[in-house]
């Protein structure tokens, strides 16, 4: 057989195979369309199948029609009732790790936001990590100078708890350089403070839509909690400060329902200073442990009732929990007055357990490094130094930062009490390290019925980054 004959033979065989393949497809389609629908045994071919995923990314409505899937993304159904949140706090023996985002480690090569002030808040179906971005990414030129607290680029965003604050999973919440957020059982409410120092505005969002505003009333950097607000039976409470950071300022508690402000009260606290309150629900009231940035190394305590009446004072315990602070042995404690005569401070938290108190603090007395939680017997009502439990979360060789409180609602845990939880921010970069940026990651711990061993769940990123070497 000569070469031309070989080519003709191969071509003929190939053409025959193509024709046979086409015929087989025609037969397959004919059987699918005409025969299978009539046999009564293929009920799933021409119907809609709903797949619900227990996550915030999406719910898929999948329509299957003749072997073709049509996917439509639909919104998560809203709950039809408010959370109660009038239960007492659970009594806990220690705190177990809930999540760790490792955002800075991942951000050395991933698209992760430069952030500060992360916090956690929970709905009946999920917990989310909220954070204030700087409008820039780690290891990028726009991260330069992000040690600054307030800028027009800062926004409140959130991810499902445990995720890094990355570009692909983050959800926009509000334009803000100070913020709070909480869920009433039906929708998320967020408050973002932004604007110039003298005329800042707090914008209330409910279900993602702006619903109300609060204008600065003292004209001096109006600001809020940097942690979860508190919703009880559909009404949500939070605390704001307006005025100097190092002397007497003005303080207000607010109440909103479905994103509309329905009440506010001025908190009279002459000689005391309140900032960055960490609040939680307990037996139908809102209990807050705050920051005194003026003179006290003990923390202000604010208890708010549903009618916005309140009690204000200081955490009674005979151990200081702010930073910087003096020696424990030199501290006496007070339920009514600032003690310690140390300016500045750091956001922190405490939980009432009957008359006892769990309180968090940095291990270092002078810098934001290390972190521990202490349980002090009768520390909520007396100047007690009786430390009955201690747990290390970050060792003193590693940086910490802000810390704050939240609770797991009974809808999540199926318990009859609210589980107390806290988060610890771990600040990296400026001013303590040689970088052009400042950012943070966080570790989240929740109360359990067991004692938990000391360990260090520190940030762990190796600095400087490439951008810092240019």
UniProtKB/Swiss-Prot annotation:
Annotated catalytic residues:
149, 402
Annotated TM spans: 15-35
Which residues carry a glycan? 42, 46, 54, 84, 144, 293, 398
Give the record's membrane topology: Single-pass type II membrane protein
- Region Head of neuraminidase, as annotated, extends over 89-470
Q: Where does substrate bind?
A: 116, 150, 275-276, 291, 368
One biological process GO term for this chain? carbohydrate metabolic process
Q: What is its main location?
A: virion
Which of the residues are on side Virion surface? 36-470
GO CC annotations? host cell plasma membrane; membrane; virion membrane
Intracellular or extracellular location(s): Virion membrane; Host apical cell membrane
Q: Per its UniProt entry, which superkingdom is the organism in?
A: Viruses
Q: List the disulfide bonds.
A: 90-417, 122-127, 182-229, 231-236, 277-290, 279-288, 316-335, 421-446
**Binding-site residues for Ca(2+), renumbered to this chain:** 292, 296, 322
This enzyme's EC code(s): 3.2.1.18
A molecular function GO annotation = metal ion binding
HAMAP family found in the cross-reference section: INFV_NRAM
Give the miscellaneous note.
The influenza A genome consist of 8 RNA segments. Genetic variation of hemagglutinin and/or neuraminidase genes results in the emergence of new influenza strains. The mechanism of variation can be the result of point mutations or the result of genetic reassortment between segments of two different strains.
State the function annotated in the UniProt record: Catalyzes the removal of terminal sialic acid residues from viral and cellular glycoconjugates. Cleaves off the terminal sialic acids on the glycosylated HA during virus budding to facilitate virus release. Additionally helps virus spread through the circulation by further removing sialic acids from the cell surface. These cleavages prevent self-aggregation and ensure the efficient spread of the progeny virus from cell to cell. Otherwise, infection would be limited to one round of replication.
According to the record's subunit comment, the protein's assembly and interactions are: Homotetramer.
> In its UniProt entry, what is this protein called?
Neuraminidase
Q: Which organism is it from?
A: Influenza A virus (strain A/Duck/Memphis/928/1974 H3N8)
